[in-house]
């Protein structure tokens, strides 16, 4: 009986952790993948620096995603989307490479195209999925670079 009780004692916490995994996956966070020029990037969305407010048909969403490893060094990406759903008219994308301090890359609705595949609210979390393509400007020589990013985000909805 001691073997069975030992298995129960260790098995119950393990089972509880496994059952909690789907709930954790549904919490805030997500992933951004794509390219900046010819450089592939994969960034993790920081839940504590990302949120959305919805008032009627108007939405104001923003998230910060970061890539800490890789040849480019730390990279931050901030995407802000504002406007009436289902097609918000304003957006801004900012990309900052830690090695190029003060030389951010920025694009907005004039140089970028946003395709939203999903914008659904439920239980205090908003699922935001889509693709942004176009051009960003900045960097050391005020250059222009093509970007394509797909994002699959779960953002906390603020009141």
Task: Go through each PLM region and give its residues.
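N-terminal signal peptide c-region/cleavage motif recognized by signal peptidases
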Residues: 20-22
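An ectodomain-focused feature that recognizes extracytoplasmic/extracellular
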Residues: 25-109
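Acidic, glycine-rich flexible loop segments
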Residues: 90-156
